């Protein structure tokens, strides 16, 4: 085990002893918020310290076995115990490294997923619709709840822009690496000469704020406009100004919601999306500062970065961040994203482990 990792584990062991002393003192319960905070910290640390205790016991067992090697009668038993002990040490070290990885506080949150058509005109809008179906089907496989918060349909049946809210256990942890540029190479339905075109969409994945109030938004910084929702018409065509557009003046972020017939619900949804976008911008600014000292390949979330290509003639999907190519395009577009999600998660963890070992 690297000394830097052992040092971190020793610090956690001492911290657990400190927490036990503080929590058992009579003064602790006088401040219930502080008491709960100490309890949460202890709950996070205790399993790691217990693992480290098991690791140190395995080290001690190996030392005892090593000492028996000098005894001819005990040598065979000692060699067997050393072999078993080495396997156990390796397994415990891997567990400890994973336990020490920094936890993303947003991993268990619900999320907003935005798909915007980029270069490619109508074809880009159609691809935005394909991505919407891909993510919706993936979410359904995970038994997550999906709802369209806002949409701007295109003439041919795709979307210029669409925002999904996805709610479910671990939703953000699995989809957070989808932010970036998604490129498609295929023959468009509007193409008469059979030529392959390249189009692009941008995907943004943002954790939902626990509470809109948790994001510091000054009401004086908002311009709120209401207007009549646009649509294809029919018996439920909107006769009132139920659509809502909120502009956050300091950042220029604009959110429109018109999918509900209630202005109140549209406004609440727009505020939720606005809070998530502001929080997301703050997070990306922080990540950009951190990236100046350490480049994180998978987790950069740079929206201008081309992260994936979907090549229809070859039936392949390539994720450029991890050089992974899968020849299962049809399955991926039907929501079979597990192989991509798992590979991206492993790469991110390897990146974190490298930083941990160097710390």
From Swiss-Prot:
GO MF terms, alphabetically ordered: translation release factor activity, codon specific
Gene3D superfamilies in the record: 3.30.160.20, 3.30.70.1660, 6.10.140.1950
GO cellular component: cytoplasm
Disulfide bonds: none
Subcellular location: Cytoplasm
Residues annotated with N5-methylglutamine modification: 235
Signal peptide start-end: none
Transmembrane region(s): none
UniProt keyword annotations, A-Z: Cytoplasm, Methylation, Protein biosynthesis
Primary location recorded for the protein, binned into one broad class: cytoplasm
UniProt modification remark: Methylated by PrmC. Methylation increases the termination efficiency of RF1.
Any coiled-coil regions, as ranges: none
Pfam families (UniProt xref): PCRF, RF-1
Superkingdom field: Bacteria
Xref: HAMAP family: Rel_fac_1
Similarity section: Belongs to the prokaryotic/mitochondrial release factor family.
Function field: Peptide chain release factor 1 directs the termination of translation in response to the peptide chain termination codons UAG and UAA.
UniProt name for this protein: Peptide chain release factor 1
The gene coding this protein: prfA
